[in-house]
């Protein structure tokens, strides 16, 4: 029987016409909407589709915040948006609703490819955005995908070609752009940067530039954050020239960027007393939910392990960027569900994460700038709820208060009651003495903190030379300050760039023009035993730990009985033997080598010939008189720089085009290779049916006509087997097809002659 459709062809056509008319009406309402004069309160008052509105209602999003009211319709009207709003003000919905509406009005399908790209600086924030999108977009027909580090890349590669809305971190998105054959960004409609200031900073600069280079320039761009850099160069990198700035928070009317319901305070304490203050605070606030921020993951790990053994009386959790993704997700779930818990964390959860009912935000280490402080304290007092924050500053870091005052943030000063303060130094010393691995953690925590102070840019706040290293080491329970080797700022910046670049991207950068990666090492099968023997120690048996303790061991041990008096010294000429003739063939070959003889003749000079045949050096120095005849030195310098800048700008455009074409060519070749592999696999799968006996040759009878007859009969039988059977029901009286009459089984017509014979048979009945 024929499949019964829900609607007939006429009804489906009417439904399409209704939807087109509804979309036109919606677009007209958007263009007529006056953002300045219309102060809507509810989402239903906005010109958005019924499916999006239904998803918002089911997710309990009824009333709008200020940033949502001001930015959603502006984004719907097609403008680029540069949005700033306080933490916890609902910026996520401010860009998710325009994304859904844009694709709905464009009638986007899975065959149109990627329509919207949302970039988040952290994995946790990307996961939160994805969860909100799934809730409010439950009644739409779009496909959404989440690509973050720590997940299976092959699983994402198989599905990324059919995704309409892609959410992810910069590194993984760029990896898919270079590696995923089916990912096509040429038709992208919207680019969204959540926490845009973090995405635009030096850590993600090259990655983001590479992503933007793969996107079409006529897209719509939305930037949102609680604190944003207004650098013209940052905006120019995103092709953001004509944009609408919405929700400015640094004006005199709005006051500070922190929520009004947040009560802020600070404590001045010595560096050696910070852990004592923290432990005493936790002991006196056991029935609260708090987040404690540190500057490095090693500090988080050390404080978590030591406090866990001292059992302060509250559940302890820790979260940092060096953990596996599964452990990070499980920790977040536990913290979401718990009501009385303390989370030790780094800045991976400082931005955008919507933690429910956080009572306290503690900052043990001073943040690098006021923007980081704003994002940290923004984890409390969200959506109008009350919250409190505390920052612990050393006497050397009091200048940070002036930085906060410049942004209209004035926390109150707290004093510590001596009766509530408890020293934990003896307990830490005892724990580190009993457990060498815990001592190693303490040494790494000490080194990471000192390095974090060294790399800070604000030297008025972070004074590296005034650090009390010995007292700080004793406060951690260490017997002395470990030896620290700092390589320099260039090496640290290079390490940061490598940290933000995925290994897959580094390997893809070594690919040839055909898109193939040539590994020098032969690919061998590595068993679990090979991996076990190749594994390096990460505890007290590691090389890093031995290097730390080497200086202490050298000081403790006595002088050796036999010592080296001198090393790598020069011998006197009278002690050297007279060697006039080479003593071996190797020495003779070395003495007669062309390379060795050229080394004694000095550097060669390269000459070029002019039109008259005169030889000139490649680089000739101009005389002083000739130089002054051309004009002032500063003017010549400016003229030279302007010319070179124009040349570099022209070449930059052509280089980008060439680079883009090379990437597309690599993708095309990779896609062609995949197609050939699939065809070969398909041919191998069905080759057995055609061969009917493997590699066996059958000889004929000697008569060519008999062999041809057998071949034709085999072909006809094979066609008969493969041909389909069609049931035609024909009413002889009414000359119409019916379901209740006799059934005549025939073959499906393949040629015009078959079709004519079938028609004749049906007419004759």
Swiss-Prot record:
InterPro entries: DEAD/DEAH_box_helicase_dom, Helicase_ATP-bd, Helicase_C-like, P-loop_NTPase, RNA-helicase_DEAD-box_CS, RNA_helicase_DEAD_Q_motif, SPB4-like_CTE. Its EC number is 3.6.4.13. Residues 575-615, 682-725 are annotated as: Disordered. SMART domains: DEXDc (SM00487), DUF4217 (SM01178), HELICc (SM00490). GO terms for molecular function: ATP binding; ATP hydrolysis activity; identical protein binding; RNA binding; RNA helicase activity. GO terms for biological process: rRNA processing. The Q motif is unique to and characteristic of the DEAD box family of RNA helicases and controls ATP binding and hydrolysis. This is ATP-dependent RNA helicase DBP4. It comes from Candida glabrata (strain ATCC 2001 / BCRC 20586 / JCM 3761 / NBRC 0622 / NRRL Y-65 / CBS 138). The lineage of its organism: Eukaryota, Fungi, Dikarya, Ascomycota, Saccharomycotina.
């Amino acid at each position: 029987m024929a499949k019964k459709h829900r609607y007939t062809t006429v009804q489906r056509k009417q439904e399409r016409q209704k939807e087109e008319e509804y979309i036109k009406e919606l677009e007209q309402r958007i263009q007529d909407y006056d953002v300045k004069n219309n102060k809507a309160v509810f989402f239903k008052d906005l010109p958005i589709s019924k499916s999006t509105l239904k998803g918002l209602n089911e997710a309990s999003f009824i009333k709008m915040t200020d940033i949502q009211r001001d930015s959603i319709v502006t984004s719907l009207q097609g403008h680029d948006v540069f949005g700033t709003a306080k933490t916890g003000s609902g910026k996520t919905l401010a860009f998710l609703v325009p994304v859904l509406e844009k694709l709905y009005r464009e009638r986007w399908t899975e065959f149109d490819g990627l329509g919207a790209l949302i970039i988040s600086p952290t994995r946790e924030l990307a996961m939160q955005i994805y969860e909100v999108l799934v809730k409010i977009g439950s009644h739409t027909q779009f496909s959404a995908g989440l690509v973050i580090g720590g997940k299976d890349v092959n699983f994402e590669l198989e599905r990324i070609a059919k995704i309409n809305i892609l959410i992810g971190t910069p590194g993984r998105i760029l990896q898919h752009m270079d590696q995923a054959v089916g990912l096509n960004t040429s038709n992208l409609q919207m680019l969204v940067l959540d926490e845009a200031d973090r995405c635009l900073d030096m850590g993600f600069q090259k990655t983001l530039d590479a992503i933007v280079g793969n996107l079409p320039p006529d897209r719509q761009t939305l930037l949102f954050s609680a604190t944003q850099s207004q650098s013209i160069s940052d905006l120019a990198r995103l092709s953001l020239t004509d944009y609408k700035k919405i929700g400015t928070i640094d004006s005199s009317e709005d006051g500070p960027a922190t929520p009004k319901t947040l009560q802020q305070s600070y404590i001045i304490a010595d560096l050696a007393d910070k852990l004592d203050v923290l432990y005493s605070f936790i002991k006196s606030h056991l029935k609260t939910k708090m987040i404690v921020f540190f500057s490095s993951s090693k500090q988080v790990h050390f404080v978590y392990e030591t406090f866990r053994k001292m059992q302060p009386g509250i559940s302890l959790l820790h979260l940092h960027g060096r953990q596996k993704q599964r452990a990070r997700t499980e920790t977040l779930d536990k913290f979401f569900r718990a009501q009385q818990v303390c989370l030790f964390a780094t800045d991976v959860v400082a931005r955008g994460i919507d933690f429910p009912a956080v009572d306290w935000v503690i900052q043990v280490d001073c943040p690098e700038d006021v923007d980081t402080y704003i994002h940290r304290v923004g984890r409390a007092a969200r959506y109008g709820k009350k919250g409190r924050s505390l920052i612990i500053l050393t006497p050397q870091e009091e200048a940070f208060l002036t930085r906060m005052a410049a942004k209209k943030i004035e926390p109150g000063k707290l004093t510590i009651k001596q009766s509530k303060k408890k020293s934990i130094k003896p307990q830490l010393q005892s724990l580190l003495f009993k457990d060498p691995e815990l001592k190693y953690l303490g040494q790494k925590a000490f080194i990471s903190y000192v390095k974090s102070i060294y790399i800070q840019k604000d030297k008025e706040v972070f004074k590296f030379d005034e650090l009390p290293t010995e007292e700080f080491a004793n406060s951690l329970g260490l017997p002395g300050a470990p030896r620290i080797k700092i390589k320099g700022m260039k090496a640290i910046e290079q390490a940061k760039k490598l940290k933000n670049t995925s290994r897959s991207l580094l390997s893809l950068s070594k690919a040839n023009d055909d898109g193939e990666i040539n590994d020098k090492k032969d690919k061998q099968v590595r068993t679990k035993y090979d991996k076990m023997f190749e594994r390096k120690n990460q505890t007290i048996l590691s090389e890093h730990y031995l290097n730390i303790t080497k200086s202490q061991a050298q000081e403790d041990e006595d002088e050796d009985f036999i010592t080296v008096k001198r090393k790598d010294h020069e011998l006197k000429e009278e002690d050297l033997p007279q060697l006039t003739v080479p003593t071996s063939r190797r020495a003779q070959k070395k003495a007669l080598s062309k390379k060795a003889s050229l080394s004694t003749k000095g550097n060669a000079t390269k000459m070029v010939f002019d039109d008259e045949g005169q030889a000139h050096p490649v680089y000739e120095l101009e005389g002083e008189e000739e130089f002054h005849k051309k004009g002032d030195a500063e003017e010549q310098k400016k003229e030279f720089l302007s010319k070179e800048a124009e040349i570099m700008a022209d070449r930059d455009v052509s280089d980008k085009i060439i680079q883009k074409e090379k990437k597309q060519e690599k993708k095309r070749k990779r896609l062609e290779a995949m197609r050939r592999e699939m065809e070969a696999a398909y041919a191998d799968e069905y080759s057995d049916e055609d061969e009917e006996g493997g590699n066996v040759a059958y000889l004929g009878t000697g008569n060519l006509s008999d062999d041809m007859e057998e071949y034709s009969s085999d072909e006809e039988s094979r066609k008969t087997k493969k041909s389909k059977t069609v049931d035609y029901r024909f009413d002889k009286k009414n000359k119409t097809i019916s379901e209740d009459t006799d059934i005549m089984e025939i073959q499906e017509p393949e040629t015009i002659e078959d079709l004519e014979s079938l028609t004749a048979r049906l007419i004759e009945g």
